[in-house]
Curated annotation (Swiss-Prot):
The lineage of its organism: Bacteria, Pseudomonadati, Pseudomonadota, Gammaproteobacteria, Pasteurellales. This is tRNA (guanine-N(7)-)-methyltransferase. Disulfide bonds: none annotated. Substrate binds at K159, D191, T228, K229, F230, E231. It comes from Histophilus somni (strain 129Pt). Keywords: Methyltransferase, S-adenosyl-L-methionine, Transferase, tRNA processing. The gene is trmB. The keyword tRNA-binding does not apply.
């Protein structure tokens, strides 16, 4: 006997809870599965998400994630917010099997593409979430639990009246600091100079973060950060790219 209860976790997906019972009718457990709405997702992406969400996906919850249980080890965890289509995130996870990666993306086709690429490359040290990043940071990430935070090419909201919509704000950086372990890093990159200047201002103003730049501003693109499609696009348009790398001080 099974009973389905459908609840919408957000506007782009729905969660189906299936109650399982023993042969004599006693309640056994509930199994949560990830079911997608049709839309811009390709059939391939939809199938990859539905078939692999149990091993690669995480759901928002109101308590902190147990990373040791999730990944099966105590390796350092690096969080990336807004991974786009996920190619560079998967490549970083593939190149660093001694680290665990957690990616947040609200664009469902990007999540589907990331999962598909992770399955293709047989990546085991990666989990993804399709949810609002601020809620994940607030509710799901314990303080002093992240080895690093990556934010590559976020929406610049280049109009002045929209600057308040930028994810990089003083309160956001303060929250990141709480989640980082001592010597944990914040790595940001953008191809908008004005946003780079704003990122630098906010990060520099944060008490407890140290800029690793020799010139006290930006660093050259490190070899460990793969070129993203946004960066390649920026190069074609003649845009510069600015990397910022800060470390949380030991107190």
């Amino acid at each position: 006997m099974t009973e389905q209860k459908i609840t919408f976790a957000d506007q782009k997906r729905k969660t189906v809870e299936i109650a399982e019972f023993t042969e004599d009718g006693r309640y056994k457990r509930k199994v949560r599965s990830f079911v997608l709405r049709t839309g811009r997702l390709s059939e391939f992406q939809r199938n990859m998400m539905n078939n692999n969400w149990a091993t690669l996906g995480l759901e928002y919850q109101t308590t902190a994630f147990d990373f040791t249980q999730i990944y099966g080890n105590t390796n350092p965890v690096i969080l990336e917010i807004g991974f786009g289509m996920g190619k560079s995130l998967v490549e970083m996870a593939l190149q660093n099997p001694d680290k665990n990666y957690l990616g947040i993306e609200v664009h469902t086709p990007g999540v589907g593409a990331c999962i598909a690429y992770a399955v293709e490359k047989q990546v085991k040290n990666l989990r993804v979430i399709c949810h609002d990043a601020t809620e994940i940071l607030q509710d799901c990430i314990a303080d002093n639990s992240l080895a690093g935070l990556q934010l590559f090419f976020p929406d610049p909201w280049h109009k002045t009246k929209h600057h308040k919509r930028r994810i990089v704000q003083p309160h956001f950086v303060e929250k990141i600091q709480q989640k980082l372990v001592p010597n944990g890093f914040v790595h940001m990159a953008t191809d908008w100079e004005n946003y780079a200047e704003y990122m630098l201002e906010v990060l520099t103003s944060a008490v407890g973060l140290r800029n690793t730049s020799a010139t006290n501003d930006y660093i050259p693109r490190p070899d460990f950060r793969p070129l993203t499609k946004f960066e390649q696009r920026g190069h074609k348009l003649g845009h510069g790219v600015w990397d910022l790398f800060f470390i949380k001080n030991i107190t």
